[in-house]
Each structure stands twice: as structure tokens, then as C-alpha cells.
Amino acid sequence: MNISAQESETRKQASRTHITKAVFPETTNHHDTLFGGTAMQWMDEVSIIAATRFSRKRLVTVSSDKIDFNNPVPAGSIVELVAEVIEFGRTSLKVKVNMFVEGMYQDGQKNAITGTFSFVAVDENMKPTPIFEE
């Protein structure tokens, strides 16, 4: 890996990604809260953006680790997803995602869901490739 600690930190900060979404009825379950599968899809989406901004490589999701549903996300609320690269290796990296929920007409957020997503950089043949030049 040919990257300095300073460059790594600069890339991590520059790749931090925020996405805000409204929770509409078509994204909810029979409890009138955000469907877990939709939450995970949104989390994968924001994490691949952060990972790509960090590496500027073609990446594939290889795992999602320990998704914790801490608070319900009711229909009609706003969520903010925040993704940041937390570690990287030769061909892989991990992104932590926090999903915060807030009422549509109230101030304040609380953490609703957290999880970590792992990615591998791949070449045009879908074989692992170094994230940074060696």
C-alpha cells in the first residue's frame, strides 16, 4: 500500500457521505415503520458511495456486519445516513454507517440503525485488485 497516514486521513474525511431521505408509506412494513430490508439497501447505497470516493476503484460489497436496529423509524419521519471509511487493507475496506431518525416536524435526531459494510476492489475480470498502487 503506497499511501501515507495523512493521505489516508484526508481521503477518509473527503469520502464521508451523507444522504437524507423521507420515510414514505411504500418503504414501511405492517408496523408502519421503515422496512428493515429498505434500511439495509439505503445503508449499502451510502456505504458504496463513501467507499468509492475513498478508493476511486470498482468495488463490490462482500459483507454487512452486525446491523443493529436501535430505534424504530416511523413512517413520516426523516432519516439521515452517514457513512465513513473506518479501515482499509490492500484490496478491501470497511465503512461504518449510522442512520439517524428525526420527526418531520420536530427538532433533534437519534441514532436508529448502525452497521458496517465491507468491500473489495476488483478489476475488469472481477478479481481482487489493490486499492492503491503498489
Q: Which residue stretches match the model-derived regions?
A:
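Hot-dog-fold acyl-thioester-processing enzymes
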Residues: 2-63, 120-134
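HotDog/MaoC-like acyl-thioester-processing domains
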Residues: 3, 9-19, 74-75, 86-134
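Conserved interaction-surface patches within small, structured recognition/assembly domains
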Residues: 62-72, 80-84
